[in-house]
Swiss-Prot record:
It catalyses: Hydrolysis of (1->4)-beta-linkages between N-acetylmuramic acid and N-acetyl-D-glucosamine residues in a peptidoglycan and between N-acetyl-D-glucosamine residues in chitodextrins. It comes from Syrmaticus reevesii (Reeves's pheasant). The active site is at 35, 52. The lineage of its organism: Eukaryota, Metazoa, Chordata, Craniata, Vertebrata. Keywords: Antimicrobial, Bacteriolytic enzyme, Disulfide bond, Glycosidase, Hydrolase, Secreted. It comes from the Eukaryota. Monomer. This is Lysozyme C. Pfam families: Lys. One of its GO terms (molecular function) is lysozyme activity. The keyword Secreted applies. Lysozymes have primarily a bacteriolytic function; those in tissues and body fluids are associated with the monocyte-macrophage system and enhance the activity of immunoagents. Its EC number is 3.2.1.17. Residues 1-129 form the C-type lysozyme domain. GO terms for biological process: defense response to Gram-negative bacterium; defense response to Gram-positive bacterium; killing of cells of another organism.
Amino acid sequence: KVYGRCELAAAMKRLGLDNYRGYSLGNWVCAAKFESNFNTHATNRNTDGSTDYGILQINSRWWCNDGRTPGSRNLCHISCSALLSSDITASVNCAKKIVSDRNGMNAWVAWRNRCKGTDVNAWIRGCRL
């Protein structure tokens, strides 16, 4: 599923991401835009053999199990395929675990490069939340 911007913002808010660990909703919507273009089915292979899955491009080396990443830690205790669902609950729950780590949202390269230090509230402007 490809979410609309405000549709995704509403879903993320409902699932408790707004100001989770101090990151406003705009940060999460911005990260999803530049990680997956709001597409829950997005997958991208990395040079180390791991793969990033779903709307927030969660990595199989650390966070989920795809059965083909050597030494996967599966810290979210989830199958990577669950992160491709049109229902983003599994992705959000895993993202909460990731952002609680010491790096916070810096774990997402696209957030670090495209969202950090910008006016992320623009991503939720005009949305009825």
